[in-house]
């Protein structure tokens, strides 16, 4: 099945054509326009600017995707689009673009959950991956643990109660003077630092829960930096990055371990923008190897927002009988 997919949930505009089947998961084209340089000026994503940039980019990306794939709109069999969750103005652009294409060419339309699409990115890197599995989705806007019983059956068993893990990285990076987005630079600095030099709290919430809270961890790091500045103390940025990274990764891996015990799953999927973090990939790999679990990580180039993952999940939504019509509306929340 040839699927046209659209992604515009935050600040990346993406259009892809994927071919999906019982034994086929293939990306024919995936064109993405990043707004990072624009939002870097403001230290974070400005929703109104993001939605306007989506409008400017989406049509040309669609043309480019068709050119690269060597096919025409008439050949498309399904249109999939991220409809929730995300920035409402950004989602609005992608949803209406997808609805217009579906209407103009008489194609079926499928709405896709953005966090489910991130997990689906792992299918593209692991052709034999099938549910059930435990999915850890970690990004700048979302952090959740889901028991994936089937391709479209997700049960969230743990999530952040406040900031997402990626948001904590970005906000600490900003205080450290690192331009947005700071996650990648924090990852590099952490490789050069000593995680034992500073103690920061865990993000795992105490009690009978798999939830996390990154707000307290973020505040603890920022307070450390501000106190050091007021005292005139020297701050070793590499050590701060290393200690922060260890707190984040160890908290996430701890929750994965607890979730595995509760669900009995033997396969773990790691996806989302923060899934590109080298320390998280290494620590989770070590844990899974030690405990005899299979780990399927989304390919690094598909960890960020992209339409290929949306098209992949759209295929399974379609097979499950999930359809949308022209009344489809974007939603900021799940």
Protein language model features and the residues they cover:
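Conserved phosphate-binding/catalytic loops in two-lobed NTP-binding clefts
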Residues: 111-112, 268, 284-309
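Glycine-rich phosphate-binding loop plus the immediately following alpha-helix
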Residues: 127, 150-194, 218-219, 223-228, ...
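Short Gly/Thr/Asp-enriched flexible loops that form oxyanion-binding sites at enzyme active sites
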Residues: 81-105, 278-287
């Amino acid at each position: 099945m040839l699927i046209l997919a659209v992604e515009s949930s935050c600040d990346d505009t993406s259009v892809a054509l994927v071919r999906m089947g019982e034994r086929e998961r293939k990306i024919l084209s995936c064109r993405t326009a990043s707004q990072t340089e624009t939002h870097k000026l403001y230290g974070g994503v400005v929703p109104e600017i993001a939605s306007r940039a989506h409008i400017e980019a989406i049509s040309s990306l669609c043309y480019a995707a068709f050119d690269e794939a060597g096919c025409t709109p008439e050949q498309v069999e399904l249109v999939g689009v991220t409809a929730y969750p995300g920035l409402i103005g950004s989602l609005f652009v992608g949803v209406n673009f997808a609805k217009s294409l579906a209407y103009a060419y008489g194609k079926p339309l499928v709405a896709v959950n953005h966090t489910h699409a991130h997990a689906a990115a792992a299918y593209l890197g692991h052709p034999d991956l099938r549910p059930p599995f435990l999915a850890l989705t970690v990004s700048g806007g979302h952090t959740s643990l889901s028991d994936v019983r089937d391709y479209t059956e997700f049960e969230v068993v743990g999530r952040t109660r406040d900031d997402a893990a990626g948001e904590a990285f970005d906000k600490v990076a900003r205080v450290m003077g690192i331009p947005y987005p700071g996650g990648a630079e924090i990852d590099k600095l952490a490789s050069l630092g000593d995680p034992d030099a500073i103690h920061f709290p865990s993000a795992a919430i105490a009690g009978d829960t798999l939830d996390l809270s990154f707000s307290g961890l973020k505040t603890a790091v920022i307070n450390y930096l501000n106190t050091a500045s007021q005292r005139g103390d020297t701050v070793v940025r590499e050590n701060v990055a290393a200690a922060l990274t260890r707190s984040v990764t160890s908290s996430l891996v701890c929750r994965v371990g607890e979730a595995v015990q509760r669900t009995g799953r033997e396969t773990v999927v790691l996806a989302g923008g923060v899934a590109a973090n080298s320390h998280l990939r290494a620590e989770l790999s070590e844990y899974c190897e030690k405990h005899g679990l299979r780990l399927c990580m989304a390919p690094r180039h598909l960890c960020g927002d992209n339409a290929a993952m949306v098209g992949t999940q759209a295929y399974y939504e379609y097979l499950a009988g999930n359809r949308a019509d022209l009344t489809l509306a974007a939603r900021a929340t799940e």
